[in-house]
């Protein structure tokens, strides 16, 4: 999914988070649940 969780001032066009990820304030994919090595993969 596209990184929608960032604020409007964040440029996240290139960031895609996996299904179990959310976007943090730095436009990085962060885990919502599950092991970190499985949930946060860029697509």
Curated annotation (Swiss-Prot):
GO biological process: cellular detoxification; cellular detoxification of metal ion; response to metal ion
GO molecular function, one term: metal ion binding
Organism of origin: Drosophila melanogaster (Fruit fly)
Function description: This protein binds cations of several transition elements. Thought to be involved in metal ion homeostasis.
Coiled-coil segments on the chain, per record: none
Taxonomic path: Eukaryota, Metazoa, Ecdysozoa, Arthropoda, Hexapoda
Family, per entry: Belongs to the metallothionein superfamily. Type 5 family.
Annotated keywords: Cadmium, Copper, Metal-binding, Zinc
Domain remark from Swiss-Prot or TrEMBL: All cysteine residues are arranged in C-X-C groups. These are thought to be the metal-binding sites in other metallothioneins.
Signal peptide per UniProt: none
Protein name: Metallothionein-3
InterPro entries recorded: Metalthion_5
Entry superkingdom: Eukaryota
Gene behind the chain: MtnC
